[in-house]
């Protein structure tokens, strides 16, 4: 084997080891993002009360709990995604839809992991990358639309008269909203990484095909040519010499 071929083989083996390790980490963080997505969709802790709010309570995308404002801290909870009429704002309904769509996309991406056993690796990476990018976009829309519903009467009763669209008044942002923003950054990074891995797999496949073609041509020529430079199967035939008789 030529030195260049040996170097190419070593590079290929080194890259494959690193690629598998990065791919495993990418898959693990994709599962983590899916868990984040499910949590922020279900949990009602997107915004909540503070020490200066008239009433205690907290709101999520579709589920919310609000107190009576009396000395007790008992909360009355309402809201269900299966019953849109219980969601206090149209903006909350739209935000819940986009976050749900993001969750479906990322769960579908995890399902696509099974395709690694049947399809081209580069193709699967690119499919997952697009799904992660769309999931991030849907989550961005959900986070941007959600504050548009802060002027709902139920939220104004809890957060005070200063509450309006994109203004929480006396209330504050809770951990689920912050976790959703972290999830957006996570999804964008995962999508970029999947595109890089997919394109690198495509380039590596092309390099392998070129190397195989070179090896095939080289082995064919080596098997045809003899060590002395003659072509095998085409030995030098003796040249007939005409003998003339003397007078």
Swiss-Prot record:
Q: Which UniProt keywords apply?
A: Cell membrane, Cell projection, Membrane, Postsynaptic cell membrane, Synapse, Transmembrane, Transmembrane helix
Q: Which GO terms describe its biological process?
A: gamma-aminobutyric acid receptor clustering; neurotransmitter receptor localization to postsynaptic specialization membrane; regulation of inhibitory synapse assembly; sensory perception of sound
GO MF terms held by the record: GABA receptor binding
Bilayer disposition of the protein: Multi-pass membrane protein
**For this UniProt entry, what is the primary localization, expressed as one broad class?**
other
InterPro entries found in the cross-reference section: LHFPL (IPR019372)
At the top level, the lineage of the source is: Eukaryota
- One Gene Ontology term, aspect cellular component: postsynaptic membrane
> What cystine pairs are annotated?
none
Give TM segment ranges.
22-42, 97-117, 127-147, 178-198
Q: Where in the cell is it found?
A: Cell projection, Dendrite; Postsynaptic cell membrane
Concerning its family, UniProt says: Belongs to the LHFP family.
Please describe what this protein does. Answer: Plays a role in the regulation of inhibitory synapse formation and function by being involved in maintening gamma-aminobutyric acid receptors (GABAARs) clustering and their associated scaffold proteins at inhibitory synaptic sites. Acts in concert with NLGN2 to recruit or stabilize GABAARs.
Can you state the subunit structure given in the record? Interacts with GABA(A) receptor subunits. Interacts with GABRB3. Interacts with GABRA2. Interacts with GABRG2. Identified in a complex of 720 kDa composed of LHFPL4, NLGN2, GABRA1, GABRB2, GABRG2 and GABRB3. Interacts with GABRA1. Interacts with NLGN2; leading to mutual regulation of protein level and synaptic clustering.
**What protein am I looking at?**
LHFPL tetraspan subfamily member 4 protein
Q: Which organism is it from?
A: Bos taurus
């Amino acid at each position: 084997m030529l030195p260049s071929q040996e170097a190419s083989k070593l590079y290929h083996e080194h890259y494959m080891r690193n690629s598998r390790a990065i791919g495993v980490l990418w898959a693990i963080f994709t599962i983590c993002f899916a868990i984040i997505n499910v949590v922020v969709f279900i949990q009602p802790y997107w915004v909540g009360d503070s020490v200066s709010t008239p009433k205690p309570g907290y709101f999520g995308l579709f589920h919310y709990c609000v107190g009576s404002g009396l000395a007790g801290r008992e909360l009355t909870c309402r809201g269900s995604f299966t019953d849109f009429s219980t969601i206090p704002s149209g903006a909350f309904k739209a935000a819940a839809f986009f976050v749900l769509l993001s969750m479906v996309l990322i769960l579908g991406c995890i399902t696509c992991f099974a395709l690694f056993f049947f399809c081209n690796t580069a193709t699967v990476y690119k499919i997952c990358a697009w799904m992660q990018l769309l999931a991030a976009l849907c989550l961005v829309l959900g986070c941007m639309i959600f504050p548009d519903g802060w002027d709902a009467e139920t939220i104004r009763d809890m957060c005070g008269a200063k509450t309006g669209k994109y203004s929480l008044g006396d209330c504050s942002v809770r951990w689920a909203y912050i976790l959703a923003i972290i999830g957006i950054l996570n999804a964008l990074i995962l999508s970029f990484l999947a595109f890089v891995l997919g394109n690198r797999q495509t380039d590596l496949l092309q390099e392998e095909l070129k190397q195989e073609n070179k090896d095939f041509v080289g082995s064919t020529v080596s098997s045809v040519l003899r060590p002395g430079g003659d072509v095998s199967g085409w030995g030098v035939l003796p040249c007939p010499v005409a003998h003339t008789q003397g007078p």
